[in-house]
């Protein structure tokens, strides 16, 4: 059994992408490999085969390994629900919410969960490919670290350090990170990968030679800047769009402070007939065909922000002029009459008035609903697949006209009597080609082009593995992975 860890000099250095690429590259070599991230902080999560939730990046990495996502792949998930606190999820299940100080004291317990998951995976797979978090050189976070070198030291694994040259200062990032590590941690770093390079590699070579001489460690390769990958962003919202047709459907997503699972909108962002715009603070909601209220980790807080920004009035105006409206998960809850949080799960306990556009109310409960689902959209009887991640229980007359008939016999969500509003708890609504096309037609798009989003993602994973083959030192990589 071999464990290899990828750490980065900064957030968004390319750790998730490199782990995905290495997983598929190893799979091509006939090696059974499994992804692992000890601790992830993200509001984008996926439901696993064993009924828990993990970061979406690990779900994509599981796809690269052709495995079903499992909670052991990301044993600690932190989902921020305020500026100073987060919901702590251990082995796929929410434990409690903590502020940063309380979580620091909890790290010893969290590390036990991390090591237990790693032990199970390493017993089942020849190679465990690990992704770190942020940077290993954050001085204020090094005590009790479980996400980077603290984990690497605990399991005694080698580390590859990746840096993003597109940011500038790549040599300072690599050398500075290395020098802030302890002597034993420095020895774990077996080589560097430089990511997102544009230009003539010959012009970079003197810098690579200097880096190897300065550190005594090899550069394992330089990966090129790639502009058109369709893989989900780990943290920030990706606003890049594909080439658009002349006649497009205008879709608006209001971005609220605790937006969750914004990867729901990636298929729309990439669709050639959809002009997707994310609207932030200080921006009015422009005229559009469709507005989508996204998921939220703090529904009542985000509702207050929505009203403060005047977006509630803009939504009412949008409906008066015949526009369509979708609410997903937290967005569904906002569309109802009331949202009650008696246990203070998402902040201070209490109740808030919803937008009152659909006749139902939601009570947040401690036990989350976590499941992968399939069913049929009430629109056009289109097949839909997705996943539920929510603590709310919603009841009311509007649910008598559901948005989705689920295969397990349950109903999900609601469609308004006038057909303008659709509410659902299902994330991943637009990933299926049938459901995406049906929803776009409902919103007013004619002659919808059917896009196979899953095929796009699979194609990009293969492209990443091709980049490993072409640009990295595969001989040294095989040695680091313990593969003959």
Curated annotation (Swiss-Prot):
| This protein's pathway | Cofactor biosynthesis; adenosylcobalamin biosynthesis
Kindly list the residue ranges recorded as spanning the membrane. none
Per its UniProt record, what SUPFAM superfamilies does this chain match?
Class I glutamine amidotransferase-like, P-loop containing nucleoside triphosphate hydrolases
Gene3D superfamilies per record:
3.40.50.880, P-loop containing nucleotide triphosphate hydrolases
Domain of life per record = Bacteria
Q: Which InterPro entries does this UniProt record tie to the protein?
A: Class_I_gatase-like (IPR029062), CobQ/CobB/MinD/ParA_Nub-bd_dom (IPR002586), CobQ_GATase1 (IPR033949), CobQ_N (IPR047045), CobQ_synth (IPR004459), GATase_3 (IPR011698), P-loop_NTPase (IPR027417)
Report if keyword Membrane is assigned: no
State the active site. Answer: 329 (nucleophile), 427
Q: Which UniProt keywords apply?
A: Cobalamin biosynthesis, Glutamine amidotransferase
First and last residue of the signal peptide: none
Query: Start and end of every GATase cobBQ-type domain?
Result: 248-435
Concerning Pfam families, the annotation shows: CbiA, GATase_3
What is a GO molecular function of this protein?
Answer: catalytic activity
Provide the GO biological process annotations.
cobalamin biosynthetic process
Describe its function: Catalyzes amidations at positions B, D, E, and G on adenosylcobyrinic A,C-diamide. NH(2) groups are provided by glutamine, and one molecule of ATP is hydrogenolyzed for each amidation.
Spell out the family assignment given in the record's similarity comment.
Belongs to the CobB/CobQ family. CobQ subfamily.
- Protein name in the entry: Cobyric acid synthase
């Amino acid at each position: 059994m071999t464990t290899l860890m990828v750490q980065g000099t900064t957030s968004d250095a390319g750790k998730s992408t490199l782990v995905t690429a290495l997983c598929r590259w190893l799979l091509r070599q006939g090696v059974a490999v499994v992804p692992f991230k000890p601790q992830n902080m993200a509001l984008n999560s996926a439901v696993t085969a064993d009924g828990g939730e993990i970061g979406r990046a690990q779900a994509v990495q599981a796809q690269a390994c052709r495995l079903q996502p499992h909670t052991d792949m990301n044993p600690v998930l932190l989902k921020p629900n305020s500026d100073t606190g987060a919901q702590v999820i251990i082995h796929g299940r929410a434990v409690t919410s903590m502020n940063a100080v309380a979580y620091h004291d909890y790290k010893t317990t969290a590390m036990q969960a991390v090591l237990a998951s790693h032990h199970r995976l390493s017993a089942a797979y020849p190679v465990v490919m690990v992704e770190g978090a942020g940077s290993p050189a954050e001085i204020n976070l090094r005590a009790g670290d479980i996400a980077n070198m603290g984990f690497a030291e605990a399991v005694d694994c080698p580390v590859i350090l990746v840096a993003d040259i597109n940011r500038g200062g790549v040599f300072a990032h690599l050398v500075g990170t290395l020098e802030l590590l302890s002597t034993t941690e420095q020895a774990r770093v077996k080589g560097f990968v430089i990511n997102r390079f544009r230009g003539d590699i010959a012009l970079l070579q003197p810098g690579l030679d200097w880096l190897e001489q300065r550190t005594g460690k090899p550069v394992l390769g330089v990966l090129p800047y790639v502009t058109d990958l369709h893989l989900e962003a780990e943290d920030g919202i990706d606003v890049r769009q594909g080439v658009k047709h002349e006649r497009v459907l205008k879709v608006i997503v209001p971005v609220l402070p605790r937006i969750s699972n914004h990867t729901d909108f990636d298929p729309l962002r990439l669709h050639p007939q959809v002009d997707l715009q994310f609207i932030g603070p200080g921006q009015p909601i422009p005229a559009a065909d469709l507005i989508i209220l996204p998921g939220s980790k703090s529904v009542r807080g985000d509702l207050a922000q929505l009203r403060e920004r005047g977006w509630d009035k803009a939504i009412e105006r949008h409906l008066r002029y015949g526009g369509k409206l979708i609410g997903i998960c937290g967005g569904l809850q906002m569309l109802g009459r009331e949202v009650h949080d008696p246990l203070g799960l998402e902040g201070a306990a209490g109740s808030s008035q919803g937008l009152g556009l659909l006749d139902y109310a939601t009570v947040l409960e401690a036990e989350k609903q976590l499941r992968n689902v399939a069913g049929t959209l009430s629109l056009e009887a289109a097949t839909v697949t997705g996943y539920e991640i929510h603590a709310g229980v919603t009841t009311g007359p509007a649910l008598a006209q559901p948005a989705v008939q689920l295969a397990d016999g349950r109903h999900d969500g609601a469609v308004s009597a006038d057909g303008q509003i659709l509410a659902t708890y299902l994330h991943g609504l637009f990933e299926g080609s049938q459901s995406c096309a049906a929803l776009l037609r409902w919103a007013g798009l004619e002659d919808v082009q059917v896009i196979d989003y899953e095929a796009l993602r699979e194609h990009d994973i293969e492209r990443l593995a091709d980049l490993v083959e072409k640009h990295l030192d595969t001989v040294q990589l095989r040695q680091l992975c313990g593969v003959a």
